[in-house]
């Protein structure tokens, strides 16, 4: 990315350019996501690749988001374009649905069952319960509601073999309403279960939106206000003897 944006070749050239733009922005100690991003990759790449996408995803200006959110993204002064650093990366053959179906085996699965409506009965089934729902919902919002972001998917079947040539493409500009498009066939290298080419393709446009009660909460808003409220709920959770809290 640094090479395409600035024409730099060596890691030192890229580092010098980032430092130059960081100084131009007057940043010494980053106070928010915007300043942290500029410190990491410079103003040009922040405005081209980070600002629009991040503000669509979170529904808030980057200046109102905490700096630690952007720190998890890897920055490499190399030509390695992998997102993860793991030596081995992959997805299950046949997809996650097939893998989960195999894992469940003889396990009883209850669909359309509200845990809270049957809590006493369900808790009695095992010594430990793994709860993966929102922590504020577990405590009936007694300390107030945490804020979440929700996601809406718009699927479309296209009468063509290839739409974008890749499983996921992010749209980093502010003008495009969706954050990314998923072309599902490329998770299986464009083949069906028998290894045949697929003449059509399915895409899903992904839209981020503010969560409200009744919506599906996809991820929590990770700012200072919500962080403080979560810590209070965490104290309550630590007093629950037979419940293991998981999830995002």
For the regions a protein language model found, what residue spans apply to each?
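Residue-level signal for well-ordered alpha-helical segments
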Residues: 14, 31, 76-80, 84-86, ...
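Short linear sequence elements within intrinsically disordered, low-complexity coil regions
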Residues: 7, 51, 58, 63, ...
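Short, highly charged low-complexity linear segments
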Residues: 17, 190-191, 243
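Short FAD-binding loop at a beta-strand-to-alpha-helix junction that anchors the flavin cofactor
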Residues: 237-248
